[in-house]
């Protein structure tokens, strides 16, 4: 069987490079005034965050596929080895199907699945808070919070696999960014009434 994880792995490498290029561009982006976005040019830093957001989403999605393919290959090899090394030939280890591995929700597959699901769960409040903060408070501040949020989301697959409370290293900063941006935007909106 061909190594099916090569396609998603190559996409992961390309997306990681794109994410790094966007981050480098954002780091070199200077001269953005503080305060609410007044035109499209002042939204530049936020647009870079949105580009990185899409790259990270697809990176997590391709990682989810690559993980399922590699776990499937590993479990098939283990089943084959168990069948060929069993004494007397009576034990016949059945290799799991790709669907059983992909939707079984165990081990590395569970971590990859949760990384995608958690990212998607956090997407609506993050995007709303990011854009409201940029429009009502500060585009550069929204971009800074956006980069922190993306960093917190990026480490989720790694900390999810660790014992609790490691996952809080990802979730708490992300919640904090969303809460801060949204609270500041709501305060700015209310103070203008």
Q: Which residues make up each language-model segment?
A:
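Long, highly hydrophobic alpha-helical transmembrane signal-anchor segments
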Residues: 2-65
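Interfacial loop-to-transmembrane junctions
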Residues: 154-179
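Core segments of transmembrane alpha-helices
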Residues: 13, 117-130, 178
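Cytosolic, membrane-interface loops and tails of multi-pass inner-membrane proteins
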Residues: 63-114
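Transmembrane alpha-helical segments that form the membrane-embedded catalytic/substrate-channel core
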Residues: 54-72, 152-159
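Small-residue-rich segments of transmembrane alpha-helices in multi-pass membrane proteins
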Residues: 13-18, 171-185
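Juxtamembrane boundary at the C-terminal end of a transmembrane helix
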Residues: 29, 182-193
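Short alpha-helical packing/oligomerization segments
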Residues: 130-151
């Amino acid at each position: 069987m061909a190594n099916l994880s090569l396609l998603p792995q190559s996409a992961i490498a390309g997306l990681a490079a794109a994410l790094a290029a966007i981050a480098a561009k954002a780091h070199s982006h200077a001269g953005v005034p503080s305060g609410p976005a007044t035109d499209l040019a002042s939204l530049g830093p936020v647009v870079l965050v949105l580009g990185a957001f899409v790259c990270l989403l697809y990176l997590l999605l391709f990682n989810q596929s690559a993980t399922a393919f590699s776990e499937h290959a590993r479990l098939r090899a283990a089943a084959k080895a168990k069948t060929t090394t069993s004494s007397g030939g009576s034990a016949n280890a059945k290799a799991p199907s790709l669907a059983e591995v992909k939707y079984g929700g165990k081990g590395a597959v569970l971590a990859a699945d949760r990384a995608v699901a958690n990212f998607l769960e956090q997407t609506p409040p993050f995007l709303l808070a990011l854009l409201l903060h940029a429009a009502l408070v500060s585009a550069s501040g929204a971009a800074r919070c956006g980069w922190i949020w993306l960093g917190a989301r990026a480490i989720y697959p790694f900390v999810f696999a660790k014992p609790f409370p490691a996952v809080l290293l990802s979730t708490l900063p992300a919640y904090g960014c969303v809460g801060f941006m949204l609270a500041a935007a709501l305060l700015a909106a209310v103070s203008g009434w």
